[in-house]
């Protein structure tokens, strides 16, 4: 390929510059060309390229740089150099890391509160974080029709998805400082009248239950998208119903399904796992078909299919007759950032998933070691060549995260079972990606918020308080377990490990 040319891009300070060079070009040629385009002196240029370009000037850049690729360039342009002040001032560099992120990163966009609509805003943010669902809605073409569900009033469900698409487009494009989902809200109230309930005295719209909205939106999307949507969330159970007083009275149901797991909260529930197991193993009283008398039955559910995305609902609200409202269980119930549900599966299914889990854990260990190694590699601050502004540090981290994300996903994928169903989790492990919280004493008052994990940085989370969006530390998420009327986890969104 000697003597031929190839094209690629360099990205610097948010701008992309196309470059054409000979396949024989050296790093010195690249730096000279980049200096013309960006005004970053050659000596200050740093390239995010595997193998590096900061050594000998005679290093050939092809095939270190692939044709059509985009390479991140770091370095301060000559015109923007500012000498260090003699005395300390309050510059960006003096801010805490999370404050620097908020200065340089384009924060996600929030939703305007239209009067007791925080339940809608928090739910939409959580759904938007589910990338497969987000893409499905953004790519929705109304002319493609709806599923063959046979549901009545399919057109109104189609309209809900269309309005969700408009909202998601605004979140994605960041066209406005905040999004006003008024048309979606009106469509929801038309389809589901409970969300149009007004206060009998003030006449204003009442606060609603975010979990109820979550369920109804799932219903609408199931009607519009059918299995294409449902498979990513469908949990399948093998249910055994047994009369505790008669060993011969046993019923087994193989294919029961749901779109979420419930975490039951009793006076002894301290951890989410206990609440989930309690929800899968219950006692009920019913009439026996064999004896004709009422009897106590044990209902044991074992999971026989795990979805790509797992939704967990904390059953915090219960109907209180004395107040005629859904009151809230304030108990603290700790949830994990990584959830392993191996002990909730049928024995055969567990054996398959545990085998894959162990292989994925090896990849995760290697990934964590590489990340620790990268963090240890710091640029020498005493060298003018290696001076990095906070903006460059931020861009460096983003570039590293983006470049490595696909690589590790491919590594995980190598260990997926060949018979994996569409929308199925390859293992029995999930990572937390979002939490919808409630603040207050009952579902008809208080405030809902969403806490969403960054798609590239697992340690960075965003707090969505309607249209006010901020970055929070991972430690803040741990405090959402409850224990009072402050933010308490209500709905948790998990994504399959390695996906």
UniProtKB/Swiss-Prot annotation:
Domain Ubiquitin-like, chain residue ranges per copy: 6-80
Query: GO cellular component annotations, sorted alphabetically?
Result: proteasome complex; proteasome regulatory particle
GO biological process annotations for this chain's record? mitochondria-associated ubiquitin-dependent protein catabolic process; negative regulation of ERAD pathway; negative regulation of proteasomal protein catabolic process; protein deubiquitination; regulation of proteasomal ubiquitin-dependent protein catabolic process
The record's annotation in PROSITE patterns points to: USP_1, USP_2, USP_3
Statement: the UniProt record of this protein carries the keyword Kinase: no
Assembly behavior? Associates with the regulatory particle (RP) of the proteasome.
Protein EC: 3.4.19.12
Species name:
Saccharomyces cerevisiae (strain ATCC 204508 / S288c) (Baker's yeast)
Molecular functions per Gene Ontology:
cysteine-type deubiquitinase activity; proteasome binding
Q: What are the USP domain coordinates in residue numbering?
A: 109-497
Indicate, by first and last residue, each region the UniProt record lists as having compositional bias (Basic and acidic residues): 365-374
Query: What does the protein in this record do?
Result: Predominant proteasome-associated deubiquitinase which releases ubiquitin from the proteasome targeted ubiquitinated proteins. Ensures the regeneration of ubiquitin at the proteasome. Has proteasome-inhibitory activity and delays the degradation of ubiquitinated proteins to provide a time window allowing gradual deubiquitination of the substrate. Stabilizes the association of HUL5 with proteasomes and works in opposition to polyubiquitin elongation activity of HUL5.
Q: Which Gene3D superfamilies match?
A: 6.10.140.1140, Cysteine proteinases, Phosphatidylinositol 3-kinase Catalytic Subunit, Chain A, domain 1
Q: Which family does it belong to?
A: Belongs to the peptidase C19 family. USP14/UBP6 subfamily.
Keywords for the protein's UniProt record, in alphabetical order: Hydrolase, Phosphoprotein, Protease, Thiol protease, Ubl conjugation pathway
UniProt domain comment? The N-terminal ubiquitin-like domain is required for proteasome association and UBP6 activation at the proteasome.
Q: How is its activity regulated?
A: Activated by it's association with the proteasome.
State the protein's name: Ubiquitin carboxyl-terminal hydrolase 6
> Gene for this protein?
UBP6
Q: Which reaction does it catalyse?
A: Thiol-dependent hydrolysis of ester, thioester, amide, peptide and isopeptide bonds formed by the C-terminal Gly of ubiquitin (a 76-residue protein attached to proteins as an intracellular targeting signal)
Which residues lie within the region annotated Disordered? 365-391
């Amino acid at each position: 390929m000697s003597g031929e040319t190839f094209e690629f891009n360099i990205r610097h300070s948010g701008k992309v510059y196309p470059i054409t060079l000979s396949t024989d070009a050296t790093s010195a040629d690249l730096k000279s060309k980049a200096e013309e385009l960006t005004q970053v002196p050659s000596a200050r240029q740093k390239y995010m390229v595997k193998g590096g370009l900061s050594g000998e000037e005679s290093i050939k850049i092809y095939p270190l740089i692939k044709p059509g690729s985009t390479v991140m360039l770091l370095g301060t342009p000559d015109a923007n150099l500012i000498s260090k002040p003699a005395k300390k001032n309050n510059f960006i560099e003096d801010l805490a890391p999370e404050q620097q992120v908020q200065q340089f990163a384009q924060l996600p966009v929030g939703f305007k509160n239209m009067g007791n609509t925080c339940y809608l805003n928090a739910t939409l943010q959580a759904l938007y974080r589910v990338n497969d669902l987000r893409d499905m809605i953004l790519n929705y073409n109304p002319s493609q029709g709806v599923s063959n569900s046979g549901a009545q009033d399919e057109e109104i469900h189609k309209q809900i998805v269309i309005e969700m698409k408009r909202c998601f487009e605004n979140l994605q494009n960041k066209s406005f400082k905040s999004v006003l989902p008024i048309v979606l809200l009106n469509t929801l109230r038309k389809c589901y009248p409970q969300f149009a309930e007004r206060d009998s005295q003030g006449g204003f719209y009442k606060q609603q239950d975010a979990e109820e909205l979550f369920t109804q939106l799932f219903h609408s999307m199931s009607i519009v998208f059918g299995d294409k949507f449902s498979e990513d969330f469908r949990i399948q159970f093998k249910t055994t119903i047994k009369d505790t007083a008669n060993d011969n009275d046993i019923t087994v149901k193989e294919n029961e399904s749901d779109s979420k797991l419930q975490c039951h909260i009793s006076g002894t529930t301290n951890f989410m796992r206990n609440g989930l197991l309690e929800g899968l193993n219950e006692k009920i009283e019913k009439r026996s078909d064999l004896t004709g008398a009422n009897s106590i039955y044990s209902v044991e559910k074992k999971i026989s299919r795990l979805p790509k995305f797992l939704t967990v609902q904390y059953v915090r609200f219960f109907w209180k007759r004395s107040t005629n409202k859904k009151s809230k269980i304030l108990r603290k119930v700790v949830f994990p950032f990584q959830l392993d549900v191996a002990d909730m599966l049928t024995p055969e299914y567990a054996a398959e998933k545990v085998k894959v889990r162990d292989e994925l854990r090896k990849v995760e260990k290697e990934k964590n070691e590489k990340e620790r190694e990268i963090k240890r590699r710091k640029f020498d601050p005493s060298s003018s060549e290696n001076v990095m502004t906070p903006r460059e540090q931020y861009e460096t981290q983003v570039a590293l995260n983006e470049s490595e994300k696909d690589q590790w996903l491919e590594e995980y994928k190598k260990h997926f079972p060949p018979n994996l169903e569409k929308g199925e989790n390859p293992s029995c492990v999930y990572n937390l990606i979002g939490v919808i919280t409630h603040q207050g004493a009952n579902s008809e008052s208080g405030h809902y918020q969403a806490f969403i994990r960054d798609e590239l940085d697992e340690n960075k989370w965003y707090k969505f308080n309607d249209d006010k969006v901020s970055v929070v530390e991972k430690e803040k998420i741990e405090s959402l377990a409850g224990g009072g009327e402050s933010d308490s986890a209500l709905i948790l969104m998990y994504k399959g490990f390695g996906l």
